[in-house]
């Protein structure tokens, strides 16, 4: 079983391995530090504070990259929509009987009232 100190040393070694893509020579001074790309994916305390870019991105969670917008879900195009597949003559024929039924009902009601009085 390892002692707690050895476990900490092992975690520091793994942290150093993660940050090996960035060398201390490549990091500019804090005064002239511009936010250059940092490919370190470790989120340990040491790696979060090792440069301004990592502090903003990992420590504070601020990311200035352009976010990709989701593409709208593709709707299935129906080649024959239900409302447009009937012709004009079919629509006109379907409407006329409804009007005739209303007129016949009205005439029957009028006839019934006239005979009863």
Curated annotation (Swiss-Prot):
What positions does the record give for the motif labelled Nuclear localization signal, and RNA-binding (TAR)? 66-70
Region (Cysteine-rich) location: 38-54
Instruction: Using the UniProt annotation, give all residue ranges assigned to the region (Core).
Output: 55-65
Q: Which coarse location class describes where this protein primarily resides?
A: host cell
Cellular localisation: Host nucleus, Host nucleolus
GO terms, biological process: positive regulation of viral transcription
Question: In its keyword annotation, does this UniProt entry include Cytoplasm?
Answer: no
Ranges annotated as biased composition (Polar residues): 81-91
Q: GO cellular component annotations, sorted alphabetically?
A: host cell nucleolus
Output one GO MF annotation: RNA binding
Q: Which UniProt keywords apply?
A: Activator, Host nucleus, Host-virus interaction, RNA-binding, Transcription, Transcription regulation
Q: Report residue spans for region: Disordered.
A: 1-27, 68-117
The record's InterPro entries line, in alphabetical order, gives:
IV_Tat, Tat_dom_sf
Q: Where is the composition biased (Basic and acidic residues)?
A: 1-19
Tell me, in a sentence or two, what this protein's role is: Transcriptional activator that increases RNA Pol II processivity, thereby increasing the level of full-length viral transcripts. Recognizes a hairpin structure at the 5'-LTR of the nascent viral mRNAs referred to as the transactivation responsive RNA element (TAR) and recruits the cyclin T1-CDK9 complex (P-TEFb complex) that will in turn hyperphosphorylate the RNA polymerase II to allow efficient elongation. The CDK9 component of P-TEFb and other Tat-activated kinases hyperphosphorylate the C-terminus of RNA Pol II that becomes stabilized and much more processive. Extracellular circulating Tat can be endocytosed by surrounding uninfected cells via the binding to several surface receptors. Endosomal low pH allows Tat to cross the endosome membrane to enter the cytosol and eventually further translocate into the nucleus, thereby inducing severe cell dysfunctions ranging from cell activation to cell death. Through.
- Subunit structure, briefly? Interacts with host CCNT1. Associates with the P-TEFb complex composed at least of Tat, P-TEFb (CDK9 and CCNT1), TAR RNA, RNA Pol II. Interacts with CCNT2; the resulting complex is unable to bind to TAR RNA.
Family stated for the protein in its record: Belongs to the lentiviruses Tat family.
Query: What's the protein name?
Result: Protein Tat
């Amino acid at each position: 079983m390892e002692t707690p100190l050895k476990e900490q040393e092992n975690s520091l070694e793994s942290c150093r391995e993660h940050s090996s893509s960035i060398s201390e020579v490549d990091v500019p001074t804090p005064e002239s530090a511009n936010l250059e790309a940092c490919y370190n994916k470790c989120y340990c305390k040491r790696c979060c504070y090792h440069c301004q870019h990592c502090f903003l991105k990992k420590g504070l969670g601020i990311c200035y990259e352009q976010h990709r917008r989701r593409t709208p879900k593709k709707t299935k195009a129906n080649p024959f929509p239900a409302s447009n597949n009937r012709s004009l003559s079919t629509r006109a024929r379907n409407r006329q009987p409804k009007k005739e039924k209303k007129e016949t009902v009205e005439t029957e009601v009028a006839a019934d009232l006239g005979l009863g009085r």
